[in-house]
Amino acid sequence: MAAGMKGKRSRRRKERKNVEHGCAHIKSTFNNSIVTITDSVGNTLSWASAGGLGFRGSRKSTPFAAQMAAETAAKAAMEHGLKSIEVYVKGPGSGREAAIRSLQAAGLEVTLIKDVTPIPHNGCRPPKRRRV
């Protein structure tokens, strides 16, 4: 091993992209919410999840956790010059509306809201019914 390279890792500096319009992909499941903000081509600008922000267990699936995740992702994306977004929502979770409201409150102009939840045409067998 080289003498001066012990314990140092080379990290590329994040370059600041200038993007005015992008897409926000909100995946809201029963257990977690993930918000990814991309440019119009699909390259990721920023992302955040409820679990990544420190929410654990049943608090991860709350609308407040989704709101905080969307707010964090929006602030990071606005550093790249983002002003308006199209929102694509996927999944049955409780954080869908809260995340959209949070993106608007962060100062992003929402131009489109589209539900892209995948619907099976009688595909996989669903999990068994819960008995409580």
From Swiss-Prot:
GO terms for biological process: translation. PANTHER family: 40S RIBOSOMAL PROTEIN S14/30S RIBOSOMAL PROTEIN S11 (PTHR11759). Belongs to the universal ribosomal protein uS11 family. Part of the 30S ribosomal subunit. Interacts with proteins S7 and S18. Binds to IF-3. Located on the platform of the 30S subunit, it bridges several disparate RNA helices of the 16S rRNA. Forms part of the Shine-Dalgarno cleft in the 70S ribosome. Residues 1-16 have a biased composition (Basic residues). Disulfide bonds: none annotated. Keywords: Ribonucleoprotein, Ribosomal protein, RNA-binding, rRNA-binding. SUPFAM superfamilies: Translational machinery components. GO terms for cellular component: ribonucleoprotein complex; ribosome. GO terms for molecular function: rRNA binding; structural constituent of ribosome. This is Small ribosomal subunit protein uS11. Transmembrane segments: none annotated. Residues 1-20 are annotated as: Disordered. It holds the Pfam family Ribosomal_S11.
